[in-house]
Amino acid sequence: MKSACRKALLLAALPLALSACIKTSTEIGKDLIDQTLLYDPYTVEFPIETIHLRRADDLSGFSDTRIAIGAIRDETFGLTTRSSAFTLVPAMDTLDIGTNPQFISFKLHFEADTVSTASPGQERIFQNLFVYSLTDTLSTKETGTNKDIPHGTEIITRGIPVYDGKDSLSLEFTQAYGQKYIDALKRLGPVLIDRSEGSTINKYSDYIKEVPGIYIETDVPEGIGGRINLFNLSVLSVSSNYYYRNNNVATLTVRTTYNGVQKDTSFLFVPGEPAFYNEAEYLENNTKFYQYAFNRTTHEAPEGEAEEDIRIEGGGGLKPVIPAAQLREKVVAAIVARGGDPSKTVVNKASLILPYEMPEDLDRLDQFPKMISPTIRKTADDGTVSYAGLTDASASSENQGDLDRANQAYAPDITYHMQQVLQRTDLDTKDDADVWFLTVHSETVANATGNAQQEAEYQQMMYAMYYNNLYGGGYGGYGGYGYGGYGYGYGSYGYGGYSNYYNMMMMASMLSSMNQTTYSTTQELDKDRYYRAILNGPAVTVKNSPSCLLLAPDALRVPTFRVTFSVPKK
């Protein structure tokens, strides 16, 4: 017995003894790792001393979502305006204008989107709308948002429309202007009916040369104030996951003769179609077709260099531009000071921190862009300018340039771009790597992916299966109460039939629910809305507060570049 107890005690003590002898070594295998794979990480930050304020006037003025008209004057940026131009293209089913057509009316309608104002109380002011005929077609080569739009000086509406910022926009054109479209349809209508691919290019060109479209602008405020109005451009809306035609169209009504009978007939025109579409075919296939308006912007604020503040406005107005050469110079110096080689250095993270001070009027924060996206500006050999984003939108860890109200700053990441900048040696003479900040807005988009024909066929199949089950089995014999046909029998008009019916309808309902309208939120470049943001410039002397975690305590709240990099161990 004593021997058994002694053995048990020894066995119990053995794990303790074994564990007491275990040591963890972090050095084992160290000499087996390739030394070229070992890096030392460092984090440095430095103030950004040079920031240009440049107009983004070569952004394209074309928009496929809305038209923008209005004007705002504020004490910081002066006057900024929005005006819009677009074509009016006949829908496919409106081309037979009959004989001897007589003008009755020509009206245009747009649903309201949103408004932008510089100060409260301006949302419902009256604005005069001036509508002119375009004198030339809209160029697809010169697309800068600040470019002039050729238009006439004669008003083409009945009277001067007045808009109060509340409801949809409705315009009524003069008889003289409507007659131009009647004449165009009389001359070109018969040959425009064929809209097969490849056959309409010359027809469309002939049409827009005859009636290029319209141009809309508003009066400008004499003092501080004003409003910018946005209207939905698309003739397509989404309901139950299917596209349908809304009322964003122009309607030409004429009294004309068909087969000897005089009738009042309306003809539809789609704003901004870039070609002749077969709209009915698109709707049958539940496919969206695109429309475009050219939204022009003008600005008074001059370009210059940021000193105590950085000014950001909407449209093609002032945007901050940070020279890449400046960033590279500071980072290369930091790498060399730590014994590294810039060509072999890995950039782990690079962030541009742009702080701002809380304005006295907190409503001003609503005029800050929700996001300023870092981009680069590239010019092709033919002079075409394009902008490319620098943050990875698919990476949730990357800061896209969102407005951070808690830390009172924007802090977008440009990690991959900085890695490329380190390899450049020509930045003293080239500016294609300079960082431009553009205003971005979150847009909620309704998506239509349903197929009406497939759903109808599925419903038909379900009913066919149900009725086959209902009547194909005869009376179903005796069962329960009565003769199965109406009682609780088996496999007839009893539980079996109803059960199948409801199961099938449940499946059909499930399919239908899968085709309900879905919504997605996307980040899109916003050239239309009014923005007014004042950020801290390089000359600011305000010190950081403990509540702001992006900058070190007591650091100056100036634009700052923070970069984490790794250099190979020696």
Task: Go through the PLM ranges and name each one.
Residues K2-P15, C21-K570:
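Secreted, disulfide-rich extracellular signaling modules
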